[in-house]
Amino acid sequence: MKLKKPYDLIVVGGGHAGVEAALISAQKHCSVLLVTMDKKAIGRMSCNPAIGGLAKGQMVREIDMLGGVMGPLADRSGLQFKILNRSKGRSVWSPRAQIDKRQYESIVMKTIINENIETIVGEAVELLIKNYKIMGVVLRDGSKIKSKSVILTCGTFLSGKIHIGDRKILAGRMGEENSDGITESLGVNTGKLKTGTPPRLDRNSVDWNRTAPTWGDDAPTPLSYQTREFNPPNDPCHTVRTNKLVHQIVGDNLDKSPMFTGDIAGTGPRYCPS
């Protein structure tokens, strides 16, 4: 593998954090290499295709004030925008956007290319360290890439595991391999966080007449302070309710749930952090 002179920065992982780290560094005229296990997955939205929400909306705007791109890119790919908690005081209002996830990752990739950030497909398994100083990374195939600094934004992929009922899959995300090795090379104690992911439904299989549509704001507010022209669509979300049959199905299958079998012992967050 032939790569140019040592980079100023290597970013490991191409999710939201990795994209922000790579872009802001490139804008500061650093030479940046983004290491990802799948170029098509850069900027991919794993779970609920939304940006913002309670607490997270404030974080998006803080990123925006620091020169980040999540806000403006979300404004360009949003399907519905809404300020949550309007029934309460303004201090707890929070912006949220439902996103076209495919359009979002497409815009992210174009932005990466426009900033001349180099990308390489590979799995970083070890840090190069000399005299307590970072010197680069080692890839799974043995390649060594040198840099002045490294930022790890591996997210759920580090020794990731997925539970589906009583099945367990080693994966960073559904359909994508996890990453092993670099965690051990860090020499620090690590822990795991858990989150639950909703099932995906084929929209053509849903009787929408039996659902209640919920709309975004009539006068939508962009997530980014950088956004000037803003006329997004207002696609509805749909609310459904459970019934006794659903409760019975859940109750009859609790013995297959990792939350109840002891396979997962952690308590999930009240509001999903993804």
Where are these regions (language model features)?
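Short, flexible hinge/linker loops that cap or flank conserved catalytic cores
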Residues: K2-L3, K144
